[in-house]
């Protein structure tokens, strides 16, 4: 889940400490399923860089001043400019860079990663967002984080998590999601023995979808040569995915399961994936997460989640591309309706053949293209999807002795009433990454990272003193709930605490209202209404959680892979057919209108 971005210099709601000069890495090649021919006039591919194993996160950056790039009627300096360095943007950028595209990533803050970043305080290294890392195994085709790192010669040491999450639910229902699938099924069926066949049926369908996805080479679904090639190679797998594309997890679950409490448990499973219940969660998204946790397992990177983005950024530079920090993009420049560049807050301009926005679609079309008429397809997107709520987040350091020796790393707490699952402050998600990696905290200490849904409307308009008082009050009530349910004496064991609100997330993540991402207005037709990477504006692409397939680490990495492939085709680094492109993109656009 995406949480407040706190940079290495200041944190929470303190003023951001600006630098007088932009910082950047002039960072180089490999590939992630991109094996198509490149233009003949491109230089020969460089060798895959020596694999670098990353063991820890450092907040150091390389500082330099970079001047804006102006067009003089000649070729644009860059093949692609990526706005933002979240995981989706970095995967897209690195995948283009390994094909020897010239890429510039522009990041508003001091470090890469966005909600997958980190910050350091008083000897602690805190993950900004989720510590549950999917797509980080050493096998299959859905280990997209591992593949993305490998593509730029990077490998991170990881620690396997034996339990994905420990659920603490109403009616004293306690369920551990064990790494081994058989152990998980055994535990769940022991709680619901009368639903054993239903449990096997629902999760069996999840495996059908996961195995189909995992058998395919993952590229852009908007590129017809690839798409038709995959269909002819794997027709049954493609038809399976097409069958489930418009379906939701809750509807599938109800085909197999009748017990209302078990269905509520599946709602909680999906809520972690999508911040909505199972009836609103696309079956494909649910299946990716509910199976990858057993297939490849949850693996935590040594030194913290922030090392992923840092390693991708360094790998990008190794490929000869660039990433600039303190580069706040304020607008996208259009020339006769085509996206040709970006303008920064300090007035500098950069130009490229293509622009890739890692901002949300609301921020892209509502702010970066402010004043432009909203394209019809974006109007349709906003009819189907709304902004999900944001989060209240609490980063704490506590005395180690307050946690029992057998404490799991991740917990989901909903104590009293299933109806509170989606309510503000109703559910609590807790990560304790020091259970896996003690190096993140001083000796004798643990990190507790707590978050719960909250809307920005609950925090707007408050004077500073009232705002700070409310943060402390809400945080205290959340901590008291955990103290009562899990860890007696928790409040008195706290040695460090910082609280972030939706206002914090809006400021540091540059996300409208601090939103977690898109969620459907009603019951969606699976993923049918979710837009891909191309947009109605020539030369402009979107990447991240407001693109297919949506929210989550695997999903945004997949979005980055797809975006890079489509852009590569459009700038001549992959095969393409203009005739087939027009037909496929038209068909996909029409299908989205059915959602």
Swiss-Prot record:
Modified residues (N-acetylvaline): 57
Enzyme class: isomerase
Reactions listed under catalytic activity: 7,7',9,9'-tetra-cis-lycopene = all-trans-lycopene
GO CC, one annotated term: chloroplast membrane
Metabolic or biological pathway, per its Swiss-Prot or TrEMBL entry: Carotenoid biosynthesis; lycopene biosynthesis
Cofactor(s) the record lists: NAD(+); NADP(+); FAD
N-terminal signal peptide: none
Protein name per UniProt: Prolycopene isomerase, chloroplastic
Organism encoding this protein: Arabidopsis thaliana
Source taxonomy: Eukaryota, Viridiplantae, Streptophyta, Embryophyta, Tracheophyta
Gene encoding the protein: CRTISO
